Structure formats: C-alpha cells, structure tokens
C-alpha cells in the first residue's frame, strides 16, 4: 500500500498546475478533518475531539483573509460517529463573508480481513452555506469627485437588492484505514465530494446561472513506526473544484516525551504556491499546532505576504485495546 502514497507524492511534484481555491482552505488540514471528509468523523484514537483553527492572510499592510474553523466529533458504540463543523471566512476587512455549518455522520461497521484490521467508513454531511457582502464597504465609480477622490458620504445610484444568501449544502465521503497493530506501516486513504447541491451564485446577474462547483478531495498517507515510539507520517492531498485545484504533500514526525506528551515537527508543500513549516506539541489532552506559509514567488517579486495559522485541539484518548491507525493530528 505504501508505494501508492509515494507514487502519488511524485505525481504531485511533477504535475503542479495550481489555481486559486474556491473554498477556504487550511495548511494544517488534518487538524480540521471534517472540512476534508465526513467519513473522517471520529476516525482517531480518541473518544472525542474538539478543534479550533484560525488562519490569517495579509498582503502588504492589508488584512485580506481571516478564516476560522470549529469542529467537534465523537465516537459511539453503535458503529456511528458524529461530527459538527463550522467554518467562517471574512475578506477585505469584513466586506465579504462565507459561513458554512454542517452535521456529519460516519458509519464505521465495515471491517475486513481475518482480524478485521481493514476498516472502511462512509460519511455524509448536511448543513447550510451562507455568503454575504457589505455594500457600504464598496468604493463605486459615482462616489468619486474630481479633484477630491473617493467620497464615502456621496450616495451611489447602484442598488444591491441581494447582499446575502443562505442555501442547503451537502457532501459525502469514504475512507479506508489499515489498523493492524503488528505492522510497521499503516496505510490510509479517503475520498470526498462536497457541495453536492451546487448552490447558485447569488451575487452574479447572468443569463446562465453560475453554480458553486462540487469540490472533489483525495487524501492519503502512511503511519510509519520508528524506534523509541517515534512515528513518521508522509501524507498527500489533492483537491479540485471547477477549474481550481490544489496539490499538497508533506510529512511530520512525532517524538514522545513523558507518558502523555510529544513534540511534533514537519512541513508541507503547496505546489506552485507555498512552503509550510509547522511545529507543535501535545500535553495531556491538548495539542497546539502552528504553521507559517512561505510564498517564494511573492517574496521574489517584492510583495510582502504573511500567512499564519494556529490550531488547538482538545481530546480524550480511547481506553482499552483500541487498534487505530495513526493519522496526522497537529
């Protein structure tokens, strides 16, 4: 199984046409698993987990994008895991807003192999998608006075009859885990489709209605057990939404210290976009992760860009002999 992950890794490296994402995204995407795939709800070595993640993007001295996510998930004894997810993004200092909330259910009853080491989970998510903008923050052509410039008190003849929209949103996914505790390498992979309802763009006046494209996402990785209880996890992600696509590959290492603590260090590459080093630590029931996007293309052109991301996860570990594959958790 592991050879397929490395094959996909090299495919990502040599085929790197990347466009801007339609949906918001995170560099620490595994800290916010429900954003990727509802089948990942509860797919951890934990009874429950709650994560708060925040991403701040600045270009020059302008605060361009601010994105926050909150998720909570729990396992049950009925082969059903439950998750709740909320994502919010504001752009241009609050001029545009994107809010997505959803409830996820994952069925975990498919277990294959002699010892039921191969687990397949199916997930679905249903929620809402709200998009809005604030017309008062626009600078319109008829609000400019010759010799004066932009005059915000000058009324505009442009009318905005539809400044907000809330619609039904839905998605589905599937995930595979090799949970054999005797193996040195455990493989996992997942596939999801989001925005299956393809809601119309509420702000574009067009004869042919524009719709939000379905987002297809594939992620995979291998949990490699090293000596002294260290774990190395290479992982990849590919997302496509309309003509936009994102390819990421990375790895990270966990180094235990004490009984309930570990250090985390690694990095991602978002091809033709950014290099993302990150670090974190786990202490008792908390994990803190931090990352910083370095964009070589913008820096070489003299444009100042700063993208910082931080995540905080609270969890309760599973008791007993739980056989779960170690997935990236920042």
Q: What are these regions, as identified by a protein language model?
A:
Residues 1-5, 111-113:
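Positively charged n-region of N-terminal signal peptides that target proteins for export
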Residues 4, 14-20:
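Sec/Tat signal peptide C-region and signal peptidase I cleavage site
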Residues 21-330:
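Subset of outer-membrane beta-barrel
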């Amino acid at each position: 199984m592991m050879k397929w992950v490395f094959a996909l890794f090299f495919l990502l490296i040599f085929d790197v046409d990347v466009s801007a994402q339609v949906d918001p995204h995170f560099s620490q995407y595994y800290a916010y698993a429900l954003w990727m795939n509802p089948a990942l709800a509860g797919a951890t070595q934990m009874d429950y987990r709650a994560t708060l993640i925040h991403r701040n993007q600045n270009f020059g001295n302008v605060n361009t994008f601010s994105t926050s996510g909150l998720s909570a998930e729990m396992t049950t004894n009925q082969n059903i895991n439950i998750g709740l997810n909320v994502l919010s993004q504001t752009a241009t200092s609050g001029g545009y807003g994107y809010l997505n909330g959803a409830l996820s259910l994952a069925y975990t009853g498919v277990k294959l192999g002699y010892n039921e080491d191969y687990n397949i989970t199916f997930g679905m998510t249903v929620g809402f998608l709200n998009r809005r903008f604030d017309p008062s923050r626009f600078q319109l052509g008829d609000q400019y006075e010759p010799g004066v410039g932009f005059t915000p008190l000058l009324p505009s003849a442009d009318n905005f009859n539809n400044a907000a929209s809330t619609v039904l949103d839905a998605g589905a996914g599937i995930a595979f885990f090799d949970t054999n505790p005797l193996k040195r390498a455990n493989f996992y992979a997942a596939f999801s489709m989001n925005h299956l309802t393809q809601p119309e763009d509420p702000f574009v006046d067009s004869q042919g209605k524009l719709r939000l494209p379905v987002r297809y996402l594939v992620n995979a990785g291998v949990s490699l057990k090293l000596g002294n209880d260290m774990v190395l996890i290479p992982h990849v992600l590919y997302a496509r939404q309309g003509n936009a696509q994102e390819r990421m590959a990375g790895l990270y290492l966990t180094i235990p210290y004490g009984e309930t603590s570990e250090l985390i260090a690694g990095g991602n590459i978002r091809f033709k976009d950014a290099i993302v080093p990150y670090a974190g630590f786990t202490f008792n029931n908390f994990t803190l992760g931090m990352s910083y996007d370095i964009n070589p293309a913008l820096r070489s052109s003299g444009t100042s860009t700063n993208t910082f991301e931080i995540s905080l996860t609270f969890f309760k570990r599973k008791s007993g002999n739980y056989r779960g594959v170690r997935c990236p958790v920042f």
